[in-house]
Amino acid sequence: ETRAKQFLKVLKDTKGQPESMIQRVYRQIRETSPESNILVATGKSQIDSIKSQVGNKVDVVLEPERRDTFPAIILSCSYLAYEKGLNEDEAVIVMPVDPYADTGYFESLKKMEELINKGTANIVLMGIKPTYPSAKYGYIIPNQDGSVERFQEKPSEEYAQKLIQEGAMWNGGVFAFKLNYILNIAKKYADFSSFEEIKAKYSDLPKISFDYEVVEKE
């Protein structure tokens, strides 16, 4: 696990030097959003790899145990609120650590932040235009106004083709929301007023994905 793909230096940076996926993503975020607070939530086995590759340039939150993305996002947001002192009206963007994407992807993150700050919705998702009918991805089926009609998890290729014809997008696994939105949801499951408190109660949080527990209920 410590040699996970995001740590392998198989890519080249702008100077032609070897870099890993996590180093590339860090660089791309900094190029498009220099003032961003960057936080990585991870397990104990990857702490050393993260620190050796991006040093102290990012904050790292250690998950006490593996409990899927919903608890991990709650833990991360509580860290931002209680340890970093971020205003609870701040926009937060959650994304995978290893997207192999160009600058346009990271510019889209800024647009998601703008939509959240405008109060467009409680959660903004990234939909990616499909290039082929894949059975490996989840799909977002949007309404004409850009809201979500429904989600479809990993359909058959035949059904995926039908979804694409209906205007479906690949679910990019990227979410934007205001910090207080998630903290309010978290307090339905645990009473806490500090990062250490929610960390101590981590095992009480539902072991479920953020998509299922929050996004699809919104």
Q: What are the roles of these predicted feature ranges?
A:
Residues K129-P130, Y139-E218:
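Catalytic core of tubulin tyrosine ligase-like
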Residues N37-L39, A91, N122-I123, V174:
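Beta-sheet entry/capping signal
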Residues V58-Q144, L183-K188:
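Conserved beta-loop-beta/alpha segment of the NTase-like Rossmann-fold superfamily
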Residues T32, Q53, E83-L86, K118-G119, ...:
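Alpha-helix C-cap/termination motif
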Residues K9, L62, L125, R150-E153:
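Structural signal for conserved beta-strand scaffold positions within catalytic alpha/beta enzyme cores
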Residues E1-I50, N56-R67, Y79, F106-E107, ...:
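N-terminal glycine-rich phosphate-binding loop and ensuing alpha1 helix
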Residues G16, R66-P71, G172, L205:
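Short, conserved micro-motifs enriched in small and acidic residues
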Residues R3, P34, N56, E88, ...:
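Residue-level preference for short coil/turn positions at secondary-structure junctions
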